């Protein structure tokens, strides 16, 4: 499979690239800055571009089988996430390509909390991450309202950290997947496994799923 990946220089994006490469897929990473090309994993094809340009997204996606977005704006630029998402959705629709979006946990419901989400539950999130959480919730709403693009939104659990690849995970839809201790977590490596599994064997179309241990 030929995959074009936006956000490949990030923590999650780099692991998605590595997982895809390990399975024999071809990965083209789109980055905004020349110096980011040197940070890409060996075997990843580098391409300069901007996810905010929907026409360019469509053009770069020509000859590709799948678009993946793992974009996460830096602190202070969280407001860009919804705008970039709209551009990616438009570009994917124009190119007639499937789009997998790494989103956030903000809109996931907390089991037993009467519909409260990670974002709305009082005190669940520290103030330092509220801006990106709000942006991710808006991002999810933008996807839900889109009927023109073959999109899939993948929400990580609240605890998404570097770790090891076990190949194990459990899937959910709109609620947090929690373990016997009430924790919802997964390593970035296994989150990448879940995403590439979905890329290879599509089961979610114009909907969201989540993966955790």
Report each predicted region and the residues it spans.
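Conserved Rossmann-fold NAD(P)-dependent oxidoreductase catalytic core, especially the SDR/UDP-sugar
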Residues: 34, 86-131, 136, 141, ...
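Conserved beta-loop-beta element that borders a ligand/cofactor-binding pocket
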Residues: 141-162
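Conserved glycine-rich Rossmann-like NAD(P)H-binding loop of the short-chain dehydrogenase/reductase
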Residues: 26-32
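Mid/C-terminal beta-alpha module of Rossmann-like enzyme folds, strongest
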Residues: 2-9, 97-99, 174-213
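NAD(P)H-binding glycine-rich loop region in Rossmannoid oxidoreductase-like domains
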Residues: 4, 34-95
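N-terminal Rossmann NAD(P)H-binding glycine-rich loop of SDR-like oxidoreductase domains
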Residues: 3-23
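Glycine/proline-rich active-site loop of Rossmann-fold NAD(P)-dependent oxidoreductases
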Residues: 146-147, 161-168, 198-207
């Amino acid at each position: 499979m030929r995959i074009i990946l936006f956000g490949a220089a990030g923590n999650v994006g780099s692991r998605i690239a590595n997982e895809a490469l390990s399975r024999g897929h071809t990965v083209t990473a789109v980055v905004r800055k020349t110096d980011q090309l040197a940070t890409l994993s060996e075997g990843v094809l580098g391409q300069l571009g901007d996810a905010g340009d929907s026409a360019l997204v469509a053009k770069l996606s020509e000859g590709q089988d799948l678009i993946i977005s793992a974009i996460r704006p830096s602190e202070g630029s969280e407001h860009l996430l919804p705008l970039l998402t709209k551009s990616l959705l438009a570009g994917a629709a124009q190119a007639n390509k499937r789009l997998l979006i790494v989103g956030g946990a903000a809109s996931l419901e907390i089991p037993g909390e009467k519909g409260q989400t990670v974002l709305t539950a009082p005190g669940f999130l520290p103030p330092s991450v509220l801006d990106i959480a709000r942006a991710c919730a808006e991002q999810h709403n933008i996807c839900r309202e889109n009927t023109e693009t073959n999109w899939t939104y993948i929400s990580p659990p609240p605890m998404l950290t570097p770790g090891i690849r076990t190949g194990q995970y459990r899937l959910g839809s709109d609620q947090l997947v929690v373990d016997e201790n009430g924790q919802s977590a997964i390593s970035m490596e296994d989150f990448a496994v879940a995403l590439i599994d979905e890329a290879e064997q599509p089961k979610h179309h114009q909907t969201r799923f989540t993966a955790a241990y």
